Amino acid sequence: MSTPANYTRVPLCEPEELPDDIQKENEYGTLDSPGHLYQVKSRHGKPLPEPVVDTPPYYISLLTYLNYLILIILGHVHDFLGMTFQKNKHLDLLEHDGLAPWFSNFESFYVRRIKMRIDDCFSRPTTGVPGRFIRCIDRISHNINEYFTYSGAVYPCMNLSSYNYLGFAQSKGQCTDAALESVDKYSIQSGGPRAQIGTTDLHIKAEKLVARFIGKEDALVFSMGYGTNANLFNAFLDKKCLVISDELNHTSIRTGVRLSGAAVRTFKHGDMVGLEKLIREQIVLGQPKTNRPWKKILICAEGLFSMEGTLCNLPKLVELKKKYKCYLFIDEAHSIGAMGPTGRGVCEIFGVDPKDVDILMGTFTKSFGAAGGYIAADQWIIDRLRLDLTTVSYSESMPAPVLAQTISSLQTISGEICPGQGTERLQRIAFNSRYLRLALQRLGFIVYGVADSPVIPLLLYCPSKMPAFSRMMLQRRIAVVVVAYPATPLIESRVRFCMSASLTKEDIDYLLRHVSEVGDKLNLKSNSGKSSYDGKRQRWDIEEVIRRTPEDCKDDKYFVN
């Protein structure tokens, strides 16, 4: 397929020239009232309640399936006509000159005929710091998103799309200063893998700081979060081992487990009864064919599930781990730094001793404004991983500026530098998350997740509403992320609001007014009232929501979970 003459690459944009005070405000909004803070409480000793999953009316589910059916029929008709009358435009799907097609017509159908129709809603180019506001680069397509051209326009949008939980995405401040100083001292790259010449004193300092913050004996840092999981399991699992994984675990965990060669069994998301039954069953059955006992059994779950906004039932997982002599792995990519009274993730939320979790994994991209990932565990496990992990021997180590950003953000959260700032950031994101979640529920939207989760999924269902919502919000200068199959179940398309401490209460009010307006136009307010405190009021007026919810969101009785 040839590239059209009018195709252009993403343009290079000049940095925005603004006074320092305005630039700072655009990246991290000033707290407008001490009343817009919330101190997260630990759930120590409290069981995790069963999540209340609201469902839409039957006609919405029916229309969603019908929507997909129409798209599939039209796509197959398009394919048939194209491969019959325009073969030169479909060479990658047809045999030609004795060559097999590059792609299977069936395997690529979803991407070509469904996703491409809404591709303008994904991977939108941006420039500048993704803080409170993000600068979006305007683009246009004249061929149903096959190619894009760029108008040159750049416009700021309120940022609900970035994993900037604590607002450390800033061009000025203690973290940026530390990163710039590290460039002068260490350059921008360490020059090799960790096992050779790639280890500096910054790596050692970061690992000690992470281990102390998490509450484990030692830690190991990596240059890529996805690669941390993808390469981890191969070091201590083989075909004689069993992994029992939550069905909604991240693809990086799935990739890593597959590469290890271990057997895999999945349990329904959050179903602890089903998990225990599966563990007992596998202990009895043992390995396939031989029925010998499994060499080791590893339970894998995420601390905070990024598509659902739900927490794992960590106390029950630890109980099952001890009862059946299994190992436990928890991925805290989205919970570490952003959740818990002091930002120490699900262990702190539930009052679980980190020593009861064998391996704690996390990333630096979400709460810390950096990049890379870490593994925290007992000393002997980390020592073994330093020898066996291929990423230690063959991958580039974390660059010094990224390490400096990570170290300074960790020190800010823990109060070692800039006392009080870390606490304020944690209390701001907690308030913002609870306020937006409760307000959306009161407006009538179906929202998933727990009260304090900074990930707030709002259900859209029909695939046609996904691009409509995204485009209408972009017109209102609000950047959001829409998500569909295969990242979610087929009929549960959603918009995922990523909350940040950088947003102010006025920002959320602005967001709520426009989400309510768009929700009315797209008929998205379809909850049944299950999420309301009294179970009676299913719809609130937007002005009443904005007036009453900031105080109500601080009271746990208004949240079913």
Swiss-Prot record:
Catalytic subunit of serine palmitoyltransferase (SPT), which catalyzes the committed step in the synthesis of sphingolipids, the condensation of serine with palmitoyl CoA to form the long chain base 3-ketosphinganine. It catalyses: L-serine + hexadecanoyl-CoA + H(+) = 3-oxosphinganine + CO2 + CoA. This is Serine palmitoyltransferase 2. Coiled coil: none annotated. GO terms for cellular component: endoplasmic reticulum; membrane; serine palmitoyltransferase complex. It comes from the Eukaryota. Its EC number is 2.3.1.50. It is a multi-pass membrane protein. It is an enzyme of class 2 (transferase). Present with 54500 molecules/cell in log phase SD medium. Pfam families: Aminotran_1_2. LCB1 and LCB2 encode essential subunits of the enzyme and form a heterodimer. Component of the SPOTS complex, at least composed of LCB1/2 (LCB1 and/or LCB2), ORM1/2 (ORM1 and/or ORM2), SAC1 and TSC3. Interacts with LCB1 and TSC3. PANTHER family: CLASS II AMINOTRANSFERASE/8-AMINO-7-OXONONANOATE SYNTHASE (PTHR13693), LD36009P (PTHR13693:SF3). Pathway: Lipid metabolism; sphingolipid metabolism. Its cofactor is pyridoxal 5'-phosphate. CDD domains: KBL_like. The chain crosses the membrane at residues 57-77, 443-463.
